[in-house]
């Protein structure tokens, strides 16, 4: 695919095969439709690829990274749980230094939640992470 990341089916499979503790992180590109409408889909695609590369560089050794929708990404972390906040800060800092076609990178809203192995806890963590991502996104708009 475009970003060379796993897709939604790979993400769901990875969650089902997760043993032990972990975390799920959701990422949503801020104002992505506006980027496509203003600069065109080629620049939008370049943004997605750059974000995917940034995700790989920060989270790649600690978990698996997936593109689960148009401008939505997910990381399933299974290592370095104590470094989530640090990794999130590093990701945002790297993103702020990047450009695509002379344009600064858009912001990315992030939400995460930790889980253990029980299916109920895992499903709740996914819901919490998703809700947190949208809370952050809404907070940025106001």
Could you describe each region identified by the protein language model?
Residues 7-23, 30-57, 66-70, 74-75, ...:
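Conserved long alpha-helical elements within nucleotide-processing catalytic cores of c-di-GMP signaling
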Residues 24, 73, 108-112:
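A structural signal for short, well-ordered beta-strand segments
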Residues 85-92, 96, 114-142:
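Catalytic-core segments of nucleotide cyclases and related cyclic-nucleotide turnover enzymes
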Residues 76-77, 114:
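A structural signal for hydrophobic residues in beta-strands of small regulatory alpha/beta folds
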Residues 67-68, 95-113, 141:
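Catalytic core regions of nucleotide second-messenger enzymes
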Residues 54-58, 90-101:
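Generic non-transmembrane alpha-helical segments
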């Amino acid at each position: 695919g475009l970003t060379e990341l796993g897709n939604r089916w790979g993400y769901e499979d990875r969650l089902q095969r997760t043993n032990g503790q972990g975390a799920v992180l959701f990422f949503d590109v801020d104002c992505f439709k506006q980027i496509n409408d203003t600069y065109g889909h080629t620049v939008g695609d370049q943004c997605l690829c750059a974000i995917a590369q940034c995700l790989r560089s920060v989270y790649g050794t600690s978990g698996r990274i997936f593109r689960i929708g148009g401008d939505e990404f997910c990381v399933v972390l299974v290592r370095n749980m104590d470094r989530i906040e640090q990794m999130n800060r590093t990701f945002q800092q790297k993103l702020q230094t990047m450009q695509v076609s002379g344009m600064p990178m858009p912001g990315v809203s992030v939400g995460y939640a930790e889980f253990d192995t029980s299916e109920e806890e895992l499903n709740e963590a996914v819901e919490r992470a998703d809700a947190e991502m949208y809370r952050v996104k809404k907070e940025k708009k106001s």
